[in-house]
Regions:
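Short amphipathic alpha-helix that is part of the acyltransferase structural core
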Residues: 1-27
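Conserved donor-binding loop and adjoining core beta-sheet/short helix segment
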Residues: 31-110
Length: 112
């Protein structure tokens, strides 16, 4: 497994076929948020050349110079695969920390 930045087309293609797909997990939503001061990050996990997890991650600079991150409607991932979920979550945390992130809000589109 490898944590990667995704191209818009490959992200949207994966997202459109995922069971937890939502408009809030599309590059179109990311572009709309960019017009309001957010930064768009399309991140994923690949197993070989196959995407097995992805997320639109948005970031915005706070008044104190650090960034808040937000994964609208959570990750597009198999939430029953704990190994994959842990791998992706840890890499998302590292990614945000490397970009001066102070927190990540995640609101997954799952029933509980």
């Amino acid at each position: 497994m490898k944590f990667v930045k995704l191209e818009e087309r490959e992200f949207d293609n994966f997202a459109s076929k995922h069971p937890y797909s939502s408009f809030y997990q599309t590059s179109s939503w990311g572009h709309l948020k960019e017009a309001n001061g957010w930064n768009m990050h399309l991140l994923g996990v690949k197993d070989g050349n196959k995407i097995i997890a992805a997320s639109l991650l948005l970031s915005k600079k706070t008044p104190i110079g650090y960034y808040m991150f937000y994964a609208p409607r959570g990750f597009l991932i198999d939430y029953d695969n704990m190994k994959l979920l842990e791998f992706f979550t840890e890499n998302i945390k590292k990614y945000a920390k490397d970009k001066k992130g102070i927190f990540i809000k995640i609101d997954p589109y799952i029933s509980y």
